[in-house]
Design a protein with these regions (language model features):
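Bacterial Sec-dependent N-terminal signal peptides
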Residues: 1-24
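Short S/T/G/P-rich N-terminal loop/turn motif that feeds into the first structured element of a domain
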Residues: 19-106, 111-229, 239-258
Length: 258
């Protein structure tokens, strides 16, 4: 009888968890558009602001982040980053198909949708599929006072030499307390996530935000000097868990929800 009661209680707990999390967006899609001309940038911007973003809003994505490189971007290949939340992995292909079946938004985005092979709207798209960390599963909005021109969004990708070292780094963020440290120091995180599909696995990604570049530098100085961080650095189990750190500074597009 006790076993039956335990199983019944456990079932209720799982049901309660499911009800609590059914409206949560724990999966993220990070689409990176690569382009090389001002004409392409104009077409992509027009498509995202007038067609794709309104479509996403219509389909329940009220907070979508759209970013470009911070500062004077002199690189030959430029990029626009689009961060889209999802409730499940199944929603990703479903949403993509839904857009190309929506005649209204297809018509609005005609210049992008019907771009020719001789004048493509972009060079390539790289897509990362992400799952929010167990200690920080959702997208978060920053609490910043500065305007878009000053704000700095810092996207980091930590690559690991092996899956074992990767999972130790994920543990370091979660159970190890690195996520809590970022929160305590007010890093205004947008997300922390495992990369479950992407071109540089095994790796994790996260994004933090700041009032300006000076504010960013001061935050990282405080982080480096914090006793908790020094404690984590001294732990052998977390040694050499990151083999490559790719840091990208971004600014939000004027039409971004961030």
């Amino acid at each position: 009888m006790k076993v039956i009661f335990f199983l019944f209680t456990l079932a209720l707990s799982f049901d309660s968890f499911a009800q609590t999390n059914k409206d949560k967006y724990h999966f993220f899609e990070l689409k990176v558009y690569e382009y090389s001309s001002l004409e392409q940038e104009k077409v992509i911007d027009e498509f995202l602001s007038s067609s794709f973003l309104p479509f996403l809003h219509k389909n329940g994505r009220s907070k979508v982040g759209i970013f470009s490189n911070y500062g004077n971007d002199t690189s030959a290949i430029k990029k626009i980053y689009v961060l889209i939340p999802h409730k499940s992995l199944n929603e990703i292909p479903v949403l993509q198909k839904a857009f190309f079946q929506d005649k209204e938004y297809m018509a609005i985005g005609k210049n992008y949708v019907d771009a020719s092979s001789s004048q493509p709207a972009y060079n390539r798209i790289t897509t990362y599929i992400l799952e929010g960390f167990r200690f920080a599963p959702n997208l978060m909005l920053p609490n910043l006072k500065s305007g878009n021109n000053d704000r700095v969004y810092e996207l980091r990708s930590y690559e690991s030499a092996s899956e074992k070292k990767y999972w130790k780094k994920v543990e370091m963020f979660n159970e190890g307390g690195e996520v809590d440290l970022f929160a305590r120091l007010n890093f205004n995180a947008i997300f922390y996530a495992e990369v479950i599909s992407g071109p540089t696995m095994p790796n994790l990604m996260y994004m933090t935000s700041f009032e300006n570049m000076n504010d960013r530098n001061e935050h990282w100085k405080a982080f480096s000097n914090d006793p908790k961080w020094k404690e984590l650095l001294s732990m052998k189990e977390y040694d050499q868990t990151v083999s490559k750190n790719v840091t990208t500074f971004l600014k939000a597009k004027a039409y971004s929800d961030y």
